[in-house]
């Protein structure tokens, strides 16, 4: 195994080749050189552009082996699988209610805080979700 002699000054991560170090540094610089030819959105890594492109193509390469539902992103499939297992790892510190998704907990938490971050552009009314 090669020694990791290339270290990023920003993140502290070490790499065994200079090309990986350069990729890490590009992330910190915010350089965005990969542009979507459909909507113009730009990304700092080619793989993020490829992931984004799925929203235009509708590609969903990740399939749940229990129900057949498909997803564009692996992370979405992982979150979905909690539905089948019944796992609810996200617990409200205020009332103890549990949720299978972090986003559902965040939405629920706004009931306790009264936060209403969503605003209707038509009538300016605000909502918690």
Curated annotation (Swiss-Prot):
Residue ranges covered by zinc fingers (C2H2-type): 34-56, 62-84, 90-112
Pfam family, one: zf-C2H2
Keyword entries, A-Z: DNA-binding, Metal-binding, Nucleus, Repeat, Transcription, Transcription regulation, Zinc, Zinc-finger
Matching PROSITE patterns: ZINC_FINGER_C2H2_1, ZINC_FINGER_C2H2_2
Single GO MF annotation: zinc ion binding
GO cellular component: nucleus
Compartment(s) of residence: Nucleus
Job description of the protein: May be involved in transcriptional regulation.
Family statement drawn from the similarity comment of this UniProt entry: Belongs to the krueppel C2H2-type zinc-finger protein family.
Protein name from the UniProt record: Putative zinc finger protein 702
Species of provenance: Homo sapiens (Human)
């Amino acid at each position: 195994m090669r020694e990791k002699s290339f270290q990023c000054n920003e993140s502290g991560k070490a790499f065994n080749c200079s090309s990986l170090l350069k990729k890490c540094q590009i992330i910190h610089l915010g350089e965005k050189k990969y542009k979507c030819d459909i909507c113009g959105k730009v990304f700092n890594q080619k793989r993020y552009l490829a992931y984004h492109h799925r929203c235009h193509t509708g590609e969903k390469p990740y399939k749940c082996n229990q129900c057949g539902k498909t997803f564009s992103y692996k992370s979405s499939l992982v979150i979905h699988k909690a539905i089948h297992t019944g796992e609810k790892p996200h617990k409200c510190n205020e009332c103890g209610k549990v949720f299978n998704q972090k986003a559902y907990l965040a939405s629920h938490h706004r009931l306790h805080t009264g936060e209403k971050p969503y605003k209707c552009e038509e009538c300016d009314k605000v909502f918690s979700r």
